[in-house]
């Protein structure tokens, strides 16, 4: 961290009466954000979020064409928030308005990329289950939270504390980007020759109708990263508020199956088949407006697309950002992809993988 950035952070804390807080650095994630816990004598702790605005390529302007988005870079193509604090603040406000437990925003300055948040604690779903907690009540509550969120119709613009953030749709280019990046990165990562133009053309033909269904079903607030390391158990609260939510700033209007793929096709832990089936049954009971067979078909198709996106991200983390810990997660993600491709309707795509990516290259 530069001395200028350190001084800026100290000034921000001082302006909000937090200069005397003891600062504890927290473990980072795959993003460019940094977190600290602020300890205050006799008071509850807070979280200090640091996301320099210039660290990433820009987000997607609402009216940008596909060509303009491609020129702007990955965040605009995929409709990611580029770590913008105003996206986090606006999404948090919307989630809280739906009765869900996003952190309360104590202070925020989008211009500097700094914010102070409510501290929801350390009881991540992933850690609790790893230490022997029963996953059933945790996942039941997560499903209930998704059902609550998915029954609401989010507005085109999210607003909070004078900030506005466009709530964009997970459109064809955004869905396509994950697949395109997989085609680009996986051969380099696995030591393969680049895919031929014919293979890429066939790929596009196979995936286009699945993306079309994803866009047609884009009707809900999609957290986009709804998995066990972004969910915090808050047993002192009631109902869906027991599920604390993190890392939601990239939210988009999307198909409800996307969040379900993130929850059940978790890259970092195995959700038992029994629990996965129970989650799907519970969600569909809470959403009688959805047709079961149609939802499951979309869950498999979008789940496969999501798994490929994660494979690209982890391959890039290992090869480009030199974060080798992500390599250990790849076999599980391949397992999720293979499970999705086992669906009868995805047999042609399964055939593409069998022809173009040998088993020994599915690392």
Language model: regions and residue ranges:
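Juxta-kinase regulatory segment immediately upstream of eukaryotic protein kinase catalytic domains
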Residues: 1-22
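ATP-binding pocket architecture of kinase catalytic cores
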Residues: 39-177, 188, 215-216
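ATP-binding glycine-rich phosphate-binding loop
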Residues: 18-41
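ATP/Mg2+ or Mg2+-diphosphate-binding catalytic cores
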Residues: 312-363
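Active-site acidic catalytic loop and adjacent metal/ATP-binding pocket
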Residues: 32-39, 47-48, 149, 207-260, ...
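All-alpha amphipathic helical-bundle segments outside canonical DNA-binding/catalytic cores
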Residues: 169-170, 292-303
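Active-site activation/catalytic loop segments of kinase-like enzymes and analogous catalytic loops
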Residues: 180-190, 253-290, 304-321, 333-341
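Active-site catalytic-loop/activation-segment of kinase and kinase-like phosphoryl-transfer enzymes
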Residues: 165-210
């Amino acid at each position: 961290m530069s001395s200028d950035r350190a001084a800026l952070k100290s000034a921000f804390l001082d302006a909000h009466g937090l200069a005397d807080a003891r600062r504890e650095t927290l473990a980072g994630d795959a993003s460019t954000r940094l977190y600290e816990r602020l300890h205050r004598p006799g008071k509850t702790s807070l979280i200090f979020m640091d996301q320099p605005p210039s660290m990433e390529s820009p987000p997607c302007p609402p009216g940008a064409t596909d060509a303009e988005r491609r020129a702007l870079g990955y965040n605009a193509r995929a409709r990611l928030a580029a770590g913008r604090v105003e996206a986090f603040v606006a999404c948090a406000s919307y989630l809280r308005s739906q009765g869900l437990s996003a952190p309360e925003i104590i202070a925020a300055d989008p211009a500097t990329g700094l914010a102070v948040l409510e501290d929801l604690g350390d009881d991540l779903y992933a850690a609790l289950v790893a230490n022997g907690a029963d996953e059933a009540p945790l996942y039941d509550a997560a499903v209930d939270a998704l059902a609550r969120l998915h029954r609401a119709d989010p507005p085109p613009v999210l607003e909070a504390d004078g900030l506005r953030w466009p709530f964009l749709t997970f459109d064809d280019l955004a869905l396509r980007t994950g697949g395109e990046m997989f085609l680009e990165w996986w051969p380099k990562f696995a030591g393969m020759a680049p895919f031929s133009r014919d293979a890429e053309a066939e790929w596009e033909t196979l995936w286009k109708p699945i993306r079309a269904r994803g866009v047609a079903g884009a009707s809900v607030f999609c957290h986009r990263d709804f998995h066990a390391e972004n969910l915090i158990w808050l047993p002192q609260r009631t109902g869906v508020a027991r599920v604390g939510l993190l890392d939601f700033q990239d939210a988009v209007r999307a198909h409800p199956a996307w969040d379900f793929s993130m929850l059940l096709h978790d890259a970092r832990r195995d959700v038992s088949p029994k629990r996965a089936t129970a989650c799907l049954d519970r969600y569909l009971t809470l959403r009688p407006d959805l047709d079961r067979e149609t939802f499951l078909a979309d869950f498999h198709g979008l789940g496969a697309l999501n798994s490929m996106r994660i494979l690209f991200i982890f391959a890039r983390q290992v090869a480009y950002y030199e974060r080798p810990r992500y390599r250990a997660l790849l076999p599980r993600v391949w397992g999720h992809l293979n499970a999705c491709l086992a669906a009868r309707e995805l047999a042609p795509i399964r055939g593409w993988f069998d022809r173009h990516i040998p088993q020994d290259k599915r690392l």
